[in-house]
């Protein structure tokens, strides 16, 4: 058995006129995240963690923001394809531990739905996915509600 750990991070700017997607679910809010895809920072951080653990570069390499094919892409597809990519090297997900950093909207009420969505895509139990939410106590770009960031650590094995 071989186990590996990966770390991922993502951040996107909050803007008017976009839907807010987090952990694969749509969250009602006056603003959404700006990006080439649906800009789901949680799923993007998780994908980077998975790819990093498998030593398969990063999300931008596999799903470039310069490609018409990835424009407006649903990040659930990116996560599904990332799980398939690490499987080509014989790896499967053991667990994910992630943190969302946002002042508003409050993420905690949505965490059970995020976990259910992600577990279905990853083919694991909801108990294998930990999602936490925090703020920056009004400090920095997140505190000024200019953007949302997410961090993720994952364990994979073969």
Where are each of the predicted segments found?
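RNase III-family endoribonuclease catalytic core
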Residues: 2-112, 122
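Short, low-complexity, polybasic intrinsically disordered segments
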Residues: 111-115, 145
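C-terminal edge-of-domain segments
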Residues: 142-158
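Pyridoxal 5′-phosphate
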Residues: 131-135
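N-terminal charge/polar-biased segments
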Residues: 1-3, 157-158
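Short acidic capping loops at alpha-helix termini that bridge into adjacent secondary structure
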Residues: 125-128
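Short acidic, Gly/Pro-enriched loop/turn segments at secondary-structure junctions
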Residues: 138-140
């Amino acid at each position: 058995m071989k186990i590996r750990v990966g770390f991922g991070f993502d951040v996107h700017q909050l803007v008017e006129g976009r839907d807010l997607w987090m952990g694969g679910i749509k969250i009602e809010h006056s603003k959404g995240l700006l990006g080439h895809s649906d800009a789901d920072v949680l799923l993007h951080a998780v994908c980077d963690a998975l790819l990093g653990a498998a030593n398969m570069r990063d999300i931008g390499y596999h799903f470039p923001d310069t490609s018409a094919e990835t424009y407006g892409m649903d990040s659930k597809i990116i996560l599904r394809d990332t799980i398939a990519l690490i499987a080509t090297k014989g790896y499967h997900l053991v667990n994910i531990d992630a943190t969302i950093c946002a002042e508003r909207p409050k993420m905690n009420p949505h965490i059970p739905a995020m976990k259910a969505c992600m577990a279905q895509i990853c083919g694991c139990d909801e108990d294998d996915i930990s999602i936490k939410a925090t703020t920056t106590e009004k400090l920095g770009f997140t505190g000024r509600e200019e953007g949302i960031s997410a961090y993720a650590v994952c364990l994979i094995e073969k």
